[in-house]
Every structure is written in structure tokens, then in C-alpha cells.
UniProtKB/Swiss-Prot annotation:
Self-association and partners: Homodimer.
Pfam families: bHLH-MYC_N, HLH
SMART domains the record matches: HLH
Induction: Transiently by ABA and polyethylene glycol (PEG).
Lineage of the species this protein comes from: Eukaryota, Viridiplantae, Streptophyta, Embryophyta, Tracheophyta
GO CC annotations, alphabetized: nucleus
One GO MF term: protein dimerization activity
Protein name (Swiss-Prot/TrEMBL): Transcription factor ABA-INDUCIBLE bHLH-TYPE
Keywords carried by this UniProt record: Abscisic acid signaling pathway, Activator, DNA-binding, Nucleus, Transcription, Transcription regulation
CDD domains to which the protein is assigned, alphabetical: bHLH_AtAIB_like (cd11449)
Compositional bias ranges of the Polar residues kind: 338-350
């Protein structure tokens, strides 16, 4: 088959291979048309999405939850070939601690491309897959994505895959009937699946595949987790298929151009890609690998989901102790068995504060480690609080849209106050803002230092003024008044000259002060001390101006008179 006939040019193949890997790229190019023949032939479990969400959105007591959960469901092509196709899935973004682990485990940014380039390439790949697999431009979800992370591209691109029995990770798992547990898929040299490259780029280290009679459950985590047989048995029991009545295969007359159904999802309308395929954002909880070691002493991870009332019979088939009211079921992934209690009154009661009146009796399932918790009301998930009178909070899609709108508004506000912007992208704007803030901080520091210096000078000046104020003595003599000003030598303007005279070993005989218009005259009469070197005019001037002694000092002006016995 000529690849160009399928709408794949050389540039498309290069971009898809760089983002998804060569194995995934080759598979998608070869099957982008043949998938039109896939139809769901087995009934689906109405609670499948809730069960998958319980594994991802409900952390256990150790704050652990899986990063993604995908159920590959048994499907059949029109030619009668049995394959495993996308049944449903749930995924979330790594939290801060997990994100740091992803960076240390595997970093594809070292391949030479900038993050913005990777974003454009991922969006382009999703748009290409959407069109080739029968989606229309009106419902192209990739167009509305502002940012596509490695986790999102891994999860969203996975929905276009299917596996023949015995091929790929899920296909081999289903054919053998044995589970697969990879504790370090990132550093593994072998490719467990066509999607290995995408899983590694998303930093997925632990990959678990559990076969059931309806398909294969695939779980993934960025943590490296040791194998837990109790977990395998628990999820195997929970995901047993309830509906075994085959569904009639759609006839050829229902094919009205393009793809009618792909992996059990109607792609002919505007709801080809349901909102449940969105990737959840970061959880606030923290988990450490040491917490996982609790699986050896009945402290394994716990997850919950809210099944419908008709799930009661299924849970009873695996020895689940249930109540006829609405309830919430949790899976306790414990390594060893836990004794079951058939009497709800003997179940352990969770302690509640005085402000919480809701009681939740718990019963345990022996061996499988499944916990049933009775709830009168379904608890709300963490997230945005209800607003405008809504009883339920916003779904993750609308909440994420509003979050991004607020974030964009703040970027616009930031752009308006930063004077010099190098580029218009957000990363450059943040860099310019950081530089501008640092520049302002430097200016503030300089101004603070100047203010402190000015305050110190004023304080010293005021201290000198107060402490060393001259003493004024006034005496009246006949018609004259004698004003005598007495001040310390250190604070007197002529103190430097007098000190220079003392250093020159001369004695001050007399000092006079006179005023002529705007000029003040200081007259000093000095005398050389006995035994000292002869005093010359040059020596005396050098003593008065020590800082300019190396050069020719200015001669005293007419306003300065120096006389003495030389």
C-alpha cells in the first residue's frame, strides 16, 4: 500500500516518528484506513470509566494513585478477526514530586528541540491522527489544546491503537492469560509495546497489564514499583465482564461514509472524543516508593469508585460484603489476605470529627483485599468549589479552560507593566519580567543605601550641632559690647591649620580675626620652637596642604596672611 495515498508525506512521517517513535508511527500509518472495519461486538460495562477513575483519581492512605489506567476491550473486525481496542481510559498529570522524578528518569528535551517546538509537533500529530481516523475539523479537540504535555500525547494517541491477539503488550498478555509487570520500563532495552517510546517520553516506569475475560487492564506509574500479586488478583476480580450478550455487528448499510464506530465510540457526530479522555491535572498528594513496601504487611494502595446498584451481584460474586444503599467501593491492594466480616455491624468504624456526622462502616474481602465502604452520599472529588448555585463543581474540562483564561489574563497584565519585551511568547515574557524585577531590586537597594547614608550624615551633623555648640560670652563695656565666642578646637573652621602648625613644631603666639566686606581674615602670629629646624614658607604651606604636597600648592591669597619669626 502506498503511504502517500493515506495522506502521509515525508514531513508528516518524520514528525510522527519523532513524537511517537518509529514503531508507533509505522503502526498508525499502516492502519489509519483499516480501522474503519472495527466494531464493538461485546457489551460494555457501564461502570468501566468509574472503575478506571478510581485507580487514578482516588489516592490511598499513602497518597498513591496510578498515573493512567486504560482498558483494552475485546473487539472484532468485520472480517471476523478478534483484536483488543480502546475501551476506555483515565489519566492525570504528574504532581510536582512525580514531575521531578520524570525529569531524572527520562528527558527527551535533550534531543535538540526547544519546548515550544515539541508543543507544536505534538499538536500537529494529534490533529493529523484525528483527521485520518475519521474526525472532523469541528470536533478536533487538538485545536483547543494550548499545551500538550508528554503525558497527554501518550494518553490521547493511545486511543488510536488496537492489538491483534499475541501482538503488542496487551495482545500477548491477553493470549497468554498471564499478567505483565514492568518495574522499570524507562531503562528497559526491550519494547513491550508499539507505544514504548511514548511511555518512556512520559516517564512511565511501572507498567502493569492484567488480563480479564473482557480484555486487558493497563496501569502505569512514574514510580518504580515492585510486583504485587495481590493487586493483580484484586483488579482481575473487579474488572470481570458482567455483560456477555453479544451485540449485533453493524451492517454495511450503516456505513454512510467515513468511520461509523472506532473502538466502540461513535465518530460520526460532534461527540467523537468524550470529555473523559481529558488528562487530569496535578494532584496535591505526595507519595514515596517506601510507602509501596506496605503491600507486604496489609498496607497496599487503596482506590475507590462509585458503582451503580446493579453492580451488587458482581461484587457478591467475589465475596464482597455490600449494603443495599448507595455505597462506595475501594480496592485494597494488599499482598496478604484480610479476614472478612459478613456482619456490617462488626465492621470497623472510621473516626469522624464532631462536625462530620457521616458514618462509613467498612467490610473487608478475604484474599482479594477489596474494601466496601458504605456512604449515604457520594463524596465530591477534589477540585474547584461549586459556584453560582451549582450543586456539583465544574468538570475538569471547564475548570481547566477557566484556569487557562485567568492565566492568560495575568500574562496580559504582566506584559503591560514590563517596559522591554524581547519576544511575545510566554517564556520570553517571564524572562523579561524576571530581569526587570531584578533591575528594580538593584535600584531599590541603591536608593536604600543612599537613604541610610543621608540619614547617618544628618544624624552626625545634628549631634555635632547639639553637643559642640559654641559658647557665647557677651560683655558690655561703656558704649561697646564685647562678644566672645568660645568653641572647641575640633569644631572650629581653623582647627586644621592650627593642627598643622603644631605638627610643624611651631608655637602660635597670636591669632586675630577681621572682616572686610564679604571676606573673613584669620591672622596667626607663630614662632619656631628652640632647637627645631628653621621654618620656611614652603615647609609651612606643605604642612597646611599635606594632600597636595606632591604638587605645587596654591599660594595664600591676600585673604590669608602668614607672619612670624622665621
Amino acid at each position: 500500500m502506498n503511504m502517500s495515498d493515506l495522506g502521509w508525506d515525508d514531513e508528516d512521517k518524520s514528525v510522527v516518528s519523532a513524537v511517537l517513535g518509529h514503531l508507533a508511527s509505522d503502526f498508525l500509518r499502516a492502519n489509519s484506513n483499516s480501522n474503519q472495519n472495527l466494531f464493538l461486538v461485546m457489551g460494555t460495562d457501564d461502570t468501566l470509566n468509574k472503575k478506571l477513575s478510581s485507580l487514578v483519581d482516588w489516592p490511598n492512605s499513602e497518597n498513591f494513585s496510578w498515573n493512567y489506567a486504560i482498558f483494552w476491550q475485546q473487539t472484532m473486525s468485520r472480517s471476523g478477526q478478534q483484536v483488543l481496542g480502546w475501551g476506555d481510559g483515565c489519566c492525570r498529570e504528574p504532581n510536582e514530586e512525580e514531575e521531578s522524578k520524570v525529569v531524572r528518569s527520562y528527558n527527551f528535551n535533550n534531543m535538540g528541540a526547544e519546548e515550544e517546538t515539541w508543543q507544536d509537533m505534538r499538536k500537529r500529530v494529534l490533529q493529523k491522527l484525528h483527521r485520518l481516523f475519521g474526525g472532523s475539523d469541528e470536533d478536533n479537540y487538538a485545536l483547543s489544546l494550548e499545551k500538550v504535555t508528554a503525558t497527554e500525547i501518550f494518553f490521547l494517541a493511545s486511543m488510536y491503537f488496537f492489538f491483534n491477539h499475541g501482538e503488542g503488550g496487551p495482545g500477548r498478555c491477553y493470549s497468554s492469560g498471564k499478567h505483565v509487570w514492568l518495574s522499570d520500563a524507562v531503562n528497559s532495552e526491550s519494547d513491550y509495546c508499539f507505544r514504548s517510546f511514548m511511555a518512556k517520553s512520559a516517564g512511565i516506569r511501572t507498567i502493569v497489564m492484567v488480563p480479564t475475560d473482557a480484555g486487558v487492564l493497563e496501569l502505569g506509574s512514574v514510580w518504580s514499583l515492585p510486583e504485587n500479586i495481590g493487586l493483580v488478583k484484586s483488579v482481575q476480580a473487579l474488572f470481570m465482564r458482567r455483560v456477555t450478550q453479544p451485540v449485533m455487528v453493524t451492517s454495511n448499510t450503516n456505513m454512510t461514509g467515513g468511520i461509523h464506530k472506532l473502538f466502540g465510540q461513535d465518530l460520526s457526530g460532534a461527540h467523537a472524543y468524550p470529555k473523559k479522555l481529558e488528562v487530569r491535572r496535578n494532584l496535591d498528594e505526595r507519595f514515596t516508593p517506601q510507602s509501596w513496601e506496605g503491600y507486604n504487611n496489609n498496607k497496599g494502595p487503596t482506590f475507590g469508585y462509585t458503582p451503580q446498584r446493579d453492580d451488587v451481584k458482581v461484587l457478591e460474586n467475589v465475596n464482597m460484603v455490600v449494603d443495599n444503599n448507595n455505597y462506595k467501593t475501594q480496592i485494597e491492594f494488599a499482598g496478604s489476605s484480610v479476614a472478612a466480616s459478613s456482619n456490617p455491624s462488626t465492621n470497623t468504624q472510621q473516626e469522624k470529627s464532631e462536625s462530620c456526622t457521616e458514618k462509613r462502616p467498612v467490610s473487608l474481602l478475604a484474599g482479594a483485599g477489596i474494601v466496601s465502604v458504605v456512604d449515604e452520599k457520594r463524596p465530591r472529588k477534589r477540585g474547584r468549589k461549586p459556584a453560582n448555585g451549582r450543586e456539583e463543581p465544574l468538570n475538569h474540562v471547564e475548570a481547566e479552560r477557566q484556569r487557562r483564561e485567568k492565566l492568560n489574563q495575568r500574562f496580559y497584565a504582566l506584559r503591560s507593566v514590563v517596559p522591554n519585551i524581547s519576544k511575545m511568547d510566554k517564556a520570553s515574557l517571564l524572562g523579561d519580567a524576571i530581569s526587570y524585577i531584578k533591575e528594580l531590586q538593584e535600584k531599590v537597594k541603591i536608593m536604600e543605601d543612599e537613604r541610610v547614608g543621608t540619614d547617618k550624615s544628618l544624624s552626625e551633623s545634628n549631634t555635632i550641632t547639639v553637643e559642640e555648640s559654641p559658647e557665647v560670652d557677651i560683655q558690655a563695656m561703656n558704649e561697646e559690647v564685647v562678644v566672645r565666642v568660645i568653641s572647641p578646637l575640633d569644631s572650629h573652621p581653623a582647627s586644621r591649620i592650627i593642627q598643622a602648625m603644631r605638627n610643624s613644631n611651631v608655637s602660635l603666639m597670636e591669632a586675630k580675626l577681621s572682616l572686610a566686606e564679604d571676606t573673613m581674615f584669620h591672622t596667626f602670629v607663630i614662632k619656631s620652637n628652640n632647637g627645631s629646624d628653621p621654618l620656611t614658607k614652603e615647609k609651612l604651606i606643605a604642612a597646611f596642604y599635606p594632600e597636595t604636597s606632591s604638587t605645587q600648592p596654591p599660594l595664600p591669597s591676600s585673604s590669608s596672611q602668614v607672619s612670624g619669626d622665621i
